[in-house]
């Protein structure tokens, strides 16, 4: 029997002066040991003009069709206030995750893909 594959979008965090894409180990362990599934980490794909095409539904749908679920994890970063119409200053936003996850959620829900969310992930949902 094959194990289900669960997609986990990464945060973008600075380590020194370099950006890294990462997911908290507790979320990877929850998928692996708690759910008995295989975690697949998805980088936030960076920024720049060439990245926009990667975020289109025509690019995201084949990726989401290849997995059994989407897990929107918690994070120390916050969603940028522009996403929910606030003019409050952003504290530790992760704009790359925002760009990826909001489009992933729309596509996943349109496809009927199971989505599990905690903390920041629930706010994204």
What are these regions (language model features)?
Residues 1-120:
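N-terminal beta1-alpha1 cap of cysteine-dependent amidohydrolase-like domains
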């Amino acid at each position: 029997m094959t194990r289900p594959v669960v997609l986990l979008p990464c945060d973008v965090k600075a380590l020194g002066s370099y950006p890294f894409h990462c997911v908290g180990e507790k979320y990877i362990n929850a998928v692996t040991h708690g759910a008995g599934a295989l975690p697949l980490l998805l980088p936030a794909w960076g920024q720049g003009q060439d990245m926009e095409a990667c975020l289109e539904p025509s690019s995201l749908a084949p990726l989401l069709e290849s997995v059994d679920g989407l897990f929107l994890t918690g994070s120390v970063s916050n969603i940028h206030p522009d996403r929910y119409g606030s003019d409050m200053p952003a504290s530790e936003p992760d704009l790359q995750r925002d760009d990826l996850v909001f489009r992933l959620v729309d596509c996943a829900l349109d496809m009927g893909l199971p989505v599990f969310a905690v903390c920041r992930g629930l706010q994204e949902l």
